[in-house]
Amino acid sequence: MCGIVGVVGSKNATDILMQGLEKLEYRGYDSAGIFVNGQETAAKLVKSVGRIADLRGKLGIDVSGTAGIGHTRWATHGKPTEDNAHPHTSTSGRFILVHNGVIENFVELKNEFLMNDTFKGQTDTEIAVHLIAKFAEEEGLSTLEAFKKALSLIQGSYAFALMDSEDAEVIYVAKNKSPLLIGLGEGYNMVCSDAMAMIRETSEFMEIHDKELVVLTKDNVTVMDYEGNVLSRESYTAELDLSDIGKGTYPFYMLKEIDEQPAVMRKLIATYANEDGTMKVDQDIIKGIQEADRIYIIAAGTSYHAGFGAKMMLESLTNTPVELGLASEWGYDMPLLSQKPFFIFLSQSGETADSRQVLVKVNELGLPSLTVTNVPGSTLSREATYTMLIGAGPEIAVASTKAYTGQIATLAFLAKAVGEAEGEVKAKEFDLVKELSLVAQSIEATLSEKDEIAAIVADLLPTTRNAFYIGRKQDYYVAMEASLKLKEISYIQCEGFAAGELKHGTISLIEKGTPVLALISNNEEVAAHTRGNVMETVARGASAITIVEEGVAREDDTIVVNQVHPYLSAISMVIPTQLIAYYASMQRGLDVDKPRNLAKAVTVE
């Protein structure tokens, strides 16, 4: 949600800012803007509602400079308008600010300090830049001291990048509970919400921790706390490749990322299994879980759905009870914990604000934790006790695909490793390397049937406004994820239900032509019951689509998926549903990668 990019010391600041904003599009936004300045060029501020392409269209040839900041906004305070778009300026125009996060006490700050100020928009960010200007222009503080004073008063989550038009080649940066990263170059330095926006310019990065302030010039990066104490900070090299963030010949990133899933499975085998089939999982993680009397999995959105599959495997292979919690609810109401809990946080980005809120509480209690994420160096990765990386490569499409399947596969390695360490027979007999290799083959088989799936979508989901996924056991978990994918990118109102709950209310919503998509994996008894539920909906006019594992398939089933181990069926069974969502969106002429109102990384609570 929202993206920040800034550069100082570059001869082509405008180009770098625009390319950076384009790389941040995946985070979700509704407006964008840049401010560019330089010692020998006039300052220029340009903002636009809509796509980055709209902003680029407003840029003139005179928008150039050696320093600047840019922003993609996802509206939280105020509608998507040019007045509410960032960067925001002080009344005099001297100070320019971009911000990601939520200032919780902006009303109080406005009432106490800025009652006589006039504001152009309705954002909390505009309050912040006016506050900085007040302390600098009315109290005579330096820009740095004015910024520090404002930061001491602001409550909430934020990532700030500030410029003073009177000092053209300095950027002031601060963060709290919102991601921000420094990029290091030769004769220039950068700041950005994540590394992908800077990877064309640098592979050398520096982390910023919460409640730290950074002063950037073209030759220096000074990190300090809010009291002004200078801090030492090591840089690191990011392992990102430009080819990872391109679409290649694909029309949308989502289809590319769906196709990458067999490779993700095989890469995870190489990462977490030795050649003899033994597990390569950190022994400290294994020991931490062995010492626990209960595992708590905390996640949101798609990662929450992946958590269901992880719960099933961990309980079965380790004989340890597992609870799954929604991060957004646990942040407000953490339940009574067991005597020796172990926490697992699932997050594609590693920046999910709700999950971090829970992790902060977990750390305050001194409890062990593991983050399973796709982004090394992310906030959740840094702040948890341990990290396991999915290694799926950048996921650009807002709708998560390969991160979901990668999370389940990664946690399969963890579950097997812990189970083996505990002497569990099931874990020893579970040949994960072989079974995950079969999953990769199953995915490839499904991907070879794209045209058939596209035709099914064109036949049954062309104009529908409502649809339902149903399933039992692990198929129910997949149904929830499948319904989320369909609704978020096709805008079809879709819900995923436990098939056995249909008669408890949901069946009243079935009418003639309502698509009901049933997931049926390889268990004869469960399959029979789910088929019975399908017939109940058909009797009431539903149009049924069955997605079935081959071991329980019939001639009239719609899509048949290769049979895999029950622990891993959530991976293979979800692939057809990802393609269904993709084609439903594409056939409606929608932007598959950037659905309306959604953000890739949810960095505000």
Curated annotation (Swiss-Prot):
Keyword flag Kinase: no
Question: Which reaction is recorded as catalysed by this protein?
Answer: D-fructose 6-phosphate + L-glutamine = D-glucosamine 6-phosphate + L-glutamate
Compartments where located: Cytoplasm
In alphabetical order, the GO MF annotations are:
carbohydrate derivative binding; glutamine-fructose-6-phosphate transaminase (isomerizing) activity
Q: What is its EC number?
A: 2.6.1.16
Q: Where is the SIS domain?
A: 285-424, 457-595
Alphabetical list of InterPro entries matching this protein: GATase_2_dom (IPR017932), GFAT (IPR005855), GFAT_N (IPR047084), GlmS/AgaS_SIS (IPR035466), GlmS/FrlB_SIS (IPR035490), Ntn_hydrolases_N (IPR029055), SIS_dom (IPR001347), SIS_dom_sf (IPR046348)
The reply on keyword Repeat is yes
- Pfam families reported in the protein's UniProt record: GATase_6, SIS
Instruction: List the catalytic residues.
Output: C2, K600
Please name the GO terms of the biological process aspect recorded for this protein, alphabetically: carbohydrate metabolic process; fructose 6-phosphate metabolic process; protein N-linked glycosylation; UDP-N-acetylglucosamine metabolic process
What function does this protein fulfil?
Answer: Catalyzes the first step in hexosamine metabolism, converting fructose-6P into glucosamine-6P using glutamine as a nitrogen source.
* UniProt cross-references to HAMAP family, sorted A to Z: GlmS
Quaternary assembly: Homodimer.
The name this protein carries in UniProt is Glutamine--fructose-6-phosphate aminotransferase [isomerizing]
Organism, by scientific name, is Lactococcus lactis subsp. lactis (strain IL1403) (Streptococcus lactis)
Gene for this protein?
glmS
